[in-house]
């Protein structure tokens, strides 16, 4: 894959290892972490060195290959048993992002169906991981361009709002929600992006704003509780967010706070779009009520650096995601086009590999 200096690539295979942009250090430090072992990849996913559902999927695919590379046996049955343990390790890291499980499942399926020696299986797994990487980049570019077809026709230059980071950092490159933003900017349809800071980990402030600055896209950062006010003031023409898991009926799990933004958008008659690849759709879930919601360490809420923000004796609740009901979503923008949430099931066959 040829890398462009204009875009960010958070997951790169280089010299026999995976190079990850350390997203926990942005925007102050732009550094890479080299991953050589599956255990290290699992830790990187868990600690959010790499994050964003599609990027997690790509990282997990490479993690499966790294795990396969570590298995020292020529016996096919023993190899597959050990590879299943690698799959379980990676699958235990982030419960909400369905792309993680999609990538692991695809890699396991390839391993079981590949004929030949264990070394043949390992080589095929590597090729599959690289294919998943390239496919996601192409998918994001298609999502971005498909988003142009459903954005409001007027005004000519739009002000969009996004929540969290569904950009190049959250994918193989280009982004889903920010893919739409990038395409709108490229075509002269974007005036400005408003970015929610996205408490408690501040992905909007640290990551989305950083991406926009790198490419010269005008961006205004607001706190999460300013979104409804900005809508009331007529500052927002449409909302575009990403997704970590979408149920068959269109209910969408995304970063905590997305549901609040969707409610505000509905109240102000502002279109609310979800941009995500079909690999993010979990057709086995009829609706969003069964989507597992990750709960993270409460230190994300009460501590910034070495500073404690709250008094002792306070209890904390820190869900990482919420579920936006399908009826609040104007359209879901996929690589196969933009569709109403209720029509999502019609694309199920196109998701199959």
From Swiss-Prot:
TM ranges: none
Report keywords, A-Z.
Amino-acid biosynthesis, Isomerase, Methionine biosynthesis
* Gene Ontology biological process terms from the UniProt entry: L-methionine salvage from methylthioadenosine
Instruction: Provide the catalytic activity annotation.
Output: 5-(methylsulfanyl)-alpha-D-ribose 1-phosphate = 5-(methylsulfanyl)-D-ribulose 1-phosphate
Citing just one GO molecular function, the answer is:
S-methyl-5-thioribose-1-phosphate isomerase activity
Write out the pathway annotation from the protein's UniProt entry.
Amino-acid biosynthesis; L-methionine biosynthesis via salvage pathway; L-methionine from S-methyl-5-thio-alpha-D-ribose 1-phosphate: step 1/6
Q: Which family does it belong to?
A: Belongs to the eIF-2B alpha/beta/delta subunits family. MtnA subfamily.
The protein's name: Methylthioribose-1-phosphate isomerase
Q: Which gene encodes it?
A: mtnA
């Amino acid at each position: 894959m040829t890398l462009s200096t204009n875009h960010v690539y958070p997951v790169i295979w280089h010299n026999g290892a995976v190079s990850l942009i350390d997203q926990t250090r942005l925007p102050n430090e732009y550094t890479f972490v080299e991953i050589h072992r599956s255990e290290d990849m699992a830790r990187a996913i868990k600690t959010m060195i790499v994050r964003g559902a599609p990027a997690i999927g790509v990282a997990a695919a490479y993690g499966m290959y790294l795990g396969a590379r570590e298995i020292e046996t020529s016996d096919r049955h023993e190899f597959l048993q050990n590879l299943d343990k690698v799959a379980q390790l990676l699958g235990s890291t982030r419960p909400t992002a369905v792309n993680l499980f999609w990538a692991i499942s695809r890699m396991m399926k390839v391993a079981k169906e590949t004929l030949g020696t264990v070394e043949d299986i390992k080589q095929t797994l590597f090729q599959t991981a690289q294919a998943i990487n390239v496919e996601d980049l192409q998918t994001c570019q298609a999502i971005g361009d498909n988003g142009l077809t459903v954005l409001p026709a007027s005004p000519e230059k739009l002000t969009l709002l996004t929540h969290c980071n569904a950009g190049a950092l959250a994918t193989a490159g280009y982004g889903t929600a920010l893919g739409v933003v990038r395409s709108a900017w490229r075509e002269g349809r974007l005036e400005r992006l408003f970015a929610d800071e996205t408490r408690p980990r501040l992905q909007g402030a640290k990551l989305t704003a950083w991406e926009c600055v790198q490419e010269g896209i005008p961006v205004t950062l607001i706190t999460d509780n300013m979104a409804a006010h900005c809508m009331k003031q007529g500052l927002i023409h449409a909302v575009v967010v990403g997704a970590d898991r979408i149920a068959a009926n269109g209910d969408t799990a995304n970063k905590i706070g997305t549901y609040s933004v969707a409610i505000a958008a509905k109240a102000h008659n502002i279109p609310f779009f979800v941009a995500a690849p079909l690999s993010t759709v979990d057709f086995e879930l009829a609706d969003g009520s069964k989507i597992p919601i990750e709960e993270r360490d409460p230190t994300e809420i009460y501590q910034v650096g070495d500073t404690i923000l709250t008094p002792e004796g306070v209890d904390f609740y820190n869900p990482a995601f919420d579920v936006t009901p399908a009826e609040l979503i104007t359209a879901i923008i996929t690589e196969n086009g933009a569709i109403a949430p209720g029509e999502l099931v019609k694309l199920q066959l196109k998701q199959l590999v």
